[in-house]
Amino acid sequence: MNLMRTAMLLAFMTALFMGVGYLIGGQSGMMIAFVAAAGMNFFSYWNSDRMVLSTYGAQEVDERSAPEFYGIVRDLARNAGLPMPKVYLYDNPQPNAFATGRNPQNAAVAASTGLLHALTPQEVAGVMAHELAHVQNRDTLTMTITATLAGAISMLGNFAFFFGGRRDNNNPLGAIGVLAAMIVAPLAAMLVQMAISRTREYSADRRGAEICGNPLWLASALGKIARGAAHIPNEEAEGHPATAHMFIINPLSGARMDNLFSTHPDTENRIAALHEMAQYGGGTGPSVGTPTRSGSTGPAMTANPERKSRSVPNTGRGGSQPPKGPWS
């Protein structure tokens, strides 16, 4: 189903490029747009995950630079029966996380330093289990390509503005065609994001609860992340709104028009579904354990709302120690 959805998105992207190219430059513009779309589709499949990670300045971590966080992801991947993904951290105070990659063998999960500061290890486990559920459900290819293509579509309006007014462009509809391209392209970018069904978040919540072993860990994390996202801006996401659907919670501020086309279901509804799952005994699989120095899995983490993850690399904000881990 996800492969079919991805193919449909790629076809839509190509058709949109060709349509706007025709409005701007007639048949020659349409052919140029077709070649550009084909190249972009190929590039997106192989490189869109790297582009997203680079956009947020994510840096890969391992057992030495972020031992507890890395250990949590390792144990969760084992619980899910997945290959070990690459693990990334990006320096941002807003608590959030996302997954990317074209398949489980080439997957990556990323969390913000704000997430590790704000959440307990149990809540971090719930969040990363949700992201691994996206990997297991093969949502990541669709999500990552959509982020790249939606950003490209939004640029078509500017393309129409700068090149649509030339007299030698064979535009069959004149100024009307250019105006239509300027209006339709940004709207289509939003619709592409909405093409990723909201139900994938509910599915990832349920599977994530099964992977980590406790739906309430994820429910608690969602509440904290939503409150943090509402008050702490994410400047990178604000500058690249096409990537918003990749995050566990919409990272855009509530004042943005983009939220009229939200790609996420209501957080309270997601939390309620997880509480209902816990009430009926769902998600009672193996709990993620605390990694020991030998690399084996110790006892399951005990819930302690006051405890913060020890995996947070010191970024030097408010601390006397120099930066550690990926920021050393």
UniProtKB/Swiss-Prot annotation:
Keywords: Cell inner membrane, Cell membrane, Hydrolase, Membrane, Metal-binding, Metalloprotease, Protease, Transmembrane, Transmembrane helix, Zinc. It is a multi-pass membrane protein. It comes from the Bacteria. It comes from Rhizobium rhizogenes (strain K84 / ATCC BAA-868) (Agrobacterium radiobacter). This is Protease HtpX homolog. Belongs to the peptidase M48B family. GO terms for molecular function: metalloendopeptidase activity; zinc ion binding. The active site is at E131.
